């Protein structure tokens, strides 16, 4: 089975109006009980299964269901547990103040392959040829997390833009108009 199902295969209960896939419900068993929530577009992959088993969560797939879609609640729950554990672990025990800041997780897998390739080309990232989208997204996200950012300057510029309803780009176009006149 490849995770896709037909309309006839997906009839595992009464159709729910909110479910995007013909009334499918979440394929997970949470604490011994089947999740009644409507399935979203997130699927229960081997990677998700591995992270669930590593985190010792009480989630399992229902073997009677013919699809692998999970609800948005469980998708967010799994992601939040994964991100919390990542932030808590550090080399120096996590007591330093720089580890207390909440680092947002950017999901670059949502980008198109061409965009990821353009990013790779722009920053001249060294990779082996023929990477698939997941490998390319992982390489790009590793680089993206390590880009130094001057937070003070960025915040000051943002506040300036909000207060003045302008940006530096607007100023450049105005100065070029003045030169033409």
Curated annotation (Swiss-Prot):
S-S bonds: 26-27, 35-71
Keywords: Disulfide bond, DNA-binding, Lipid-binding, Metal-binding, Nucleus, Repressor, Transcription, Transcription regulation, Zinc, Zinc-finger
Annotated spans, Disordered: 82-103
Chief location category: nucleus
Presence of the UniProt keyword Zinc in the record: yes
Biological process annotations from GO: negative regulation of transcription by RNA polymerase II; regulation of DNA-templated transcription
Function field: Functions as a transcription repressor, probably via its interaction with histone deacetylase complexes. Involved in the functional recruitment of the class 1 Sin3-histone deacetylase complex (HDAC) to the nucleolus. Binds DNA, apparently without sequence-specificity, and bends bound double-stranded DNA. Binds phosphoinositol phosphates (phosphoinositol 3-phosphate, phosphoinositol 4-phosphate and phosphoinositol 5-phosphate) via the same basic sequence motif that mediates DNA binding and nuclear import.
Similarity comment text for this entry: Belongs to the SAP30 family.
Subunit structure and binding partners: Interacts with components of the histone deacetylase complex sin3a, hdac1 and hdac2. Binds histones and nucleosomes.
This protein's name: Histone deacetylase complex subunit SAP30L-A
């Amino acid at each position: 089975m490849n995770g896709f199902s037909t309309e006839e295969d997906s009839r595992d209960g009464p159709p729910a109006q909110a479910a995007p896939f013909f009334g499918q419900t979440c394929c997970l068993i949470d604490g011994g009980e089947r999740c009644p929530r409507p399935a979203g577009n997130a699927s229960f992959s081997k990677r998700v299964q591995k992270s669930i088993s590593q985190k010792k969560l009480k989630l399992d797939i229902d073997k009677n269901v013919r699809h692998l879609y999970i609800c948005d609640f469980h998708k967010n729950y799994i992601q939040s547990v994964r991100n919390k554990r990542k932030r808590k672990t550090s080399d120096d025990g996590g007591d330093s103040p720089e580890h207390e800041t909440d680092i947002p997780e950017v999901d670059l897998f949502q980008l198109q392959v061409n965009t990821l390739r353009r990013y790779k080309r722009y920053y001249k990232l060294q990779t082996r040829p023929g990477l698939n989208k997941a490998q390319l997204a992982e390489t790009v996200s590793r680089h993206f997390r390590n880009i130094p950012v001057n937070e003070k300057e960025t915040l000051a510029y943002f506040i300036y833009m909000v207060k003045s309803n302008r940006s530096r780009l607007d100023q450049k176009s105005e100065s070029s108009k003045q030169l033409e006149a």
